[in-house]
Amino acid sequence: MRTSSMMKRMAAMSLAAAAAWATGAAAAADGAPAAQRTIQVLSVKGGDAASPQAAVWKKAPTGQVALQTAFPGHASIVGTALTQQMTAQAVRAGDRLFVRLAWRDATANTEIKDTDQFVDGAAVQFPVNGKDTTLAFMGDPDNPVNVWHWRADGRTRNLVAKGFGTATPVPAEGLRSTATRTRDGWEVVISRPLRVKAEEGADLQGRRTMPIAFAAWDGENQERDGLKAVTMEWWQLNF
């Protein structure tokens, strides 16, 4: 068997396993019913939504997002993620979408000084094709996903993935983030222009709804890569 064929077969098996696991986990999850997995985007003409403490966030509807340990995509990285819930809000200001995430995290892990240290993080994910039929776990070769990944060490990355282990950084000059360490956790705002080039990820311009998924990493718990807390199913942004 050729290497390329073998890799495709292994990828297909992993995707099938992930889909089956996600279906079972979602059915067992004590999360919001499908009708409630919706976040209404607050549209404003102007103003500052970049700061987690901006006044506009007091007006934006809040979603209570349940998280669970992700499918173990890497056999060498296993464990149980700690974060079980986060709140999510969204604001459209001009030509940008701002997403605000807040969650509890007892320790602030903001730098890596040794090989056994990892930083806190969070991410939102969109299907590039805008369809909720896309696999919520990192997509697949035919249906990629776009990830906005914030890290507590100050890095914010725009990624495109086509399945487990395929997350690839792609240029996105307009992707920005602002984070605040609170008494008991993190508050983070990630934003990006609605319209982007095809190679930059999911284009949000002109959409009335958009599937969105969430993730969090607790560095103190050795969480990194595929060891993370995630949503089992897509949520929906309503513009």
Curated annotation (Swiss-Prot):
Gene3D superfamilies reported for this sequence: 2.60.40.1190
Free-text biotechnology note from the record: Has potential use in bioremediation of waste sites contaminated with selenate, such as agricultural drainage waters.
Cofactor note (record): Binds 1 heme b (iron(II)-protoporphyrin IX) group per subunit.
Pfam families according to UniProt: EB_dh
Ways its activity is controlled: Enzyme isolated from cells grown in a tungstate rich environment shows a 20-fold reduction in selenate reductase activity.
Main location: periplasm
Catalytic activity as recorded in UniProt: selenite + 2 Fe(III)-[cytochrome c] + H2O = 2 Fe(II)-[cytochrome] + selenate + 2 H(+)
Gene Ontology molecular function: heme binding; metal ion binding; selenate reductase activity
Activity's thermal dependence: Optimum temperature is 65 degrees Celsius (with reduced methyl viologen as the electron donor). Full activity is maintained up to 60 degrees Celsius, with activity falling to 25% at 70 degrees Celsius. Substituting tungsten for molybdenum at the active site of SerA decreases the overall stability of the SerABC complex, rendering the components less thermostable.
Function according to Swiss-Prot or TrEMBL: Component of the selenate reductase, which catalyzes the reduction of selenate to selenite and allows anaerobic growth with selenate as the sole terminal electron acceptor. A c-type di-heme cytochrome of the cytc4 family was shown to donate electrons to the selenate reductase in vitro. SerABC can also use reduced benzyl viologen or reduced methyl viologen as an electron donor. This subunit accepts electrons from either a quinol-cytochrome c oxidoreductase (QCR) or a quinol dehydrogenase (QDH) via a soluble c-type cytochrome, and transfers the electrons to the iron-sulfur clusters of SerB.
EC number(s) given by UniProt: 1.97.1.9
Record note on pH: Optimum pH is 6.0. Activity is also optimum at pH 6.0 in the presence of tungsten.
Coiled-coil positions: none
Keywords: Electron transport, Heme, Iron, Metal-binding, Oxidoreductase, Periplasm, Signal, Transport
Protein's name in the database: Selenate reductase subunit gamma
Quaternary structure (record): Heterotrimer of alpha (SerA), beta (SerB) and gamma (SerC) subunits.
UniProt cofactor(s): heme b
Compartment(s): Periplasm
Any one cellular-component term (Gene Ontology): periplasmic space
